[in-house]
Amino acid sequence: MVRASWFEIPVLDLERAIDFYERVFLVELERDVVDGHDAAYFPAADGPIGAAGALMHGESYVPSLDGTRIYLGVDDVEAVVARAVEAGWSLLYPVTEVDDQLVAEIADSEGNRIALQADAD
């Protein structure tokens, strides 16, 4: 079995990205330096479910709307989308129900495509 265990979201401006993710996702990120790269960690859930990750700034980290898509699990997709749009960022894929899940995609402050996922109620 292969299971995702870690993700890194590339950023050009770490402070701008931290502001975006803290405001849109209502989380507090923890700043650090990893192998010479400025980073900001997402809070990790206890237990084996889900992957932990960080925003990463460095020359090998290039934001993109193309390529691998990360789905961030949230409690309320519509609320996250509303906060992102209110903050001036783009909705790339509208909130849609797929197999008892609500999904959507937004562009973050750095030009990454970020997918959102939650259980449909």
Predicted regions and their residues:
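Vicinal oxygen chelate
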Residues: V2-S5, I9, E30-V33, V81, ...
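Short beta-strand micro-motifs in enzyme catalytic cores
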Residues: D38-A40, T68, D100-A104
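Short, charged/polar, Gly/Pro-enriched secondary-structure boundary elements
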Residues: G47-G53, G111-I114
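Core segments of cupin and vicinal oxygen chelate
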Residues: M1-V2, E8-G50
